[in-house]
Amino acid sequence: MLDLKFIRDNLDLVKKSIKARGLVLDIDKLVYLDDKRKKIITQIGELNAKRNENSSKMRENLDNVFKSSLMETGKILKKQLIDLEEELKKISFDFDLENKRVPNILSPDVPIGNSEEDNFEIKKVGVVPKFDFKPKDHLELGRDLDLLDFDRAREVSGSKFYYLKNEAVFLEIALINFSLNKLREKGFDVFITPDVAREFIVDGIGFNPRGDESNIYKIESTDKYLVGTSEITLGGYYYNKIIDLTLPIKMAGFSHCFRKEAGAYGQLSKGLYRVHQFSKVEMFCFCKAEESQVIHDEFLSIQEQIFTELEIPYRVLNICSFDLGSPAYKKYDIEAWMPGRDGKGSYGEVTSTSNCTDYQSRRLKIRYKDQDGQNKFAHMVNGTAIATTRVIISILENFQDEKGGVRIPKSLVKYTGFGYIPFKN
């Protein structure tokens, strides 16, 4: 969430961010609720002072008539306090609800737009493969190479689940090890994170749906959720702590990710592209306010290194305002070339990285001391290192050959133990 003083001092800027994101939110209502809340708090303070004064007088040596009058006054004051405290409770609930809905402000260079066509393409890297045969999509390759089974998974678990089989199992593990080793070499602390988080941590990270439907699964009769990303559990690691940010704290977390993906059907969402469960390695950083932009660019650079070493053609996008989550000040996506996508080949999202400034740390009470010894809220940056399912799509589709097999990128061979997946009759 944003600092309330900042909101009051920059109402036009905050309203501009809300409008650019396509959100419906009455920021003036938030200011009104805050004013009303403060007024009630002042009234409660004044009534408590009167009540204390009344109680002090009752301890004096008084005649019965005056004492009875003071007792009656005390009852009235108590009733007024109870009513005001109940009103404060309701106003505070409404205020907190509205306050949490206010999104982060936007970086000045975020493209303003309401569709993916408004994302700004920064660059393209790599050569899109040209085949002298009709290429298959990853579903055909998964069947012909005995790597994927959606049919049995549908029977066992439902739609949008899958079995990885044979070489695909080692390919996923190789991608995880490849990315974790790279991040460890770059100074990240490496974690396997919980796949479950408490509701207040999920809320603190700011997973606010645009509508009424959350994209993550709640565990029935608990205050816990299955995580949609280890951003949630890494971000909550220092909940309510004052941390030492002499150097940025960089973390890499492996987790399974669970997402409802309600309504995500159609040609562009088929197969492994949009599923209910997948494995991912996430980058996360806690840093000082003045460092977050540099860290954000560093995360993008690491993502580019990963896909360059995987030999996968990709493009980098500066994401438009409408497609930013509430916590994000700025976001980059990398989209990899997928020859089987949309029947003719197109780019599909494989990573994102977001600078969330202090939006999440305010909710989670994560602070550091500046050079003057003052507590400041940490800035938080996140980014995908590897989301295995979509990278598997990219590898299968880009490196298939006329024999029906698939070459493994050289950077992965030492992790897979094989360099080629042959066609299976």
Swiss-Prot record:
PANTHER family: SERYL-TRNA SYNTHETASE. Belongs to the class-II aminoacyl-tRNA synthetase family. Type-1 seryl-tRNA synthetase subfamily. Consists of two distinct domains, a catalytic core and a N-terminal extension that is involved in tRNA binding. One of its GO terms (biological process) is selenocysteine biosynthetic process. Pfam families: Seryl_tRNA_N, tRNA-synt_2b. It catalyses: tRNA(Ser) + L-serine + ATP = L-seryl-tRNA(Ser) + AMP + diphosphate + H(+); tRNA(Sec) + L-serine + ATP = L-seryl-tRNA(Sec) + AMP + diphosphate + H(+). This is Serine--tRNA ligase. One of its GO terms (cellular component) is cytoplasm. It is an enzyme of class 6 (ligase). SUPFAM superfamilies: Class II aaRS and biotin synthetases, tRNA-binding arm. Its EC number is 6.1.1.11. HAMAP family: Ser_tRNA_synth_type1. ATP binds at residues 259-261, 275, 349-352. Its main location: cytoplasm.
